[in-house]
Amino acid sequence: MNDFFSVEPNYYLVLAAVLFTIGAAGVLVRRNAIVLFMCVELMLNAANLTLVTFSRINGDLNGQIIAFFVMVVAAAEVVVGLAIIMAIFRTRRSASVDDANLLKY
């Protein structure tokens, strides 16, 4: 076949599960907004890996197309999120998500 299936698809799915678990643990444990964004991106990449793996197993392109759109939306999310984090950092001198709650007062 090709190089993608030189490794069994199960290994890609296990890797995606491990990446998603690391990202979810980071979102639950960390309080720094930049680290939270990196963990969310890790979770999105794990979902993309799962979509691409199932797409290649089934032989269609639907999963790859959805993964591409997820990457586009994630890029837009990062742009908006980093702008908000920079605004919070300029006013509070901290990137903690606890300080974001203080913006409403």
Curated annotation (Swiss-Prot):
Keyword ATP-binding: no
Reaction(s) catalysed (UniProt annotation): a quinone + NADH + 5 H(+)(in) = a quinol + NAD(+) + 4 H(+)(out)
Keyword Cell membrane (UniProt): yes
Membrane spanning stretches: 9-29, 34-54, 65-85
Subcellular location: Cell membrane
EC number: 7.1.1.-
Molecular-function GO term, any one: quinone binding
Membrane topology: Multi-pass membrane protein
GO biological process terms, semicolon-separated: ATP synthesis coupled electron transport
Short name of one Pfam family: Oxidored_q2
Any GO CC annotation of this UniProt entry: plasma membrane
UniProt keyword terms in alphabetical order: Cell membrane, Membrane, NAD, Quinone, Translocase, Transmembrane, Transmembrane helix, Transport
Subunit and partners: NDH-1 is composed of 14 different subunits. Subunits NuoA, H, J, K, L, M, N constitute the membrane sector of the complex.
NCBIfam families: PRK05715.1-2, PRK05715.1-3, PRK05715.1-5
Primary role: NDH-1 shuttles electrons from NADH, via FMN and iron-sulfur (Fe-S) centers, to quinones in the respiratory chain. The immediate electron acceptor for the enzyme in this species is believed to be a menaquinone. Couples the redox reaction to proton translocation (for every two electrons transferred, four hydrogen ions are translocated across the cytoplasmic membrane), and thus conserves the redox energy in a proton gradient.
PANTHER family: NADH DEHYDROGENASE SUBUNIT 4L-RELATED, NADH-UBIQUINONE OXIDOREDUCTASE SUBUNIT ND4L
Family: Belongs to the complex I subunit 4L family.
Protein name (database record): NADH-quinone oxidoreductase subunit K
Organism, scientific name: Salinispora arenicola (strain CNS-205)
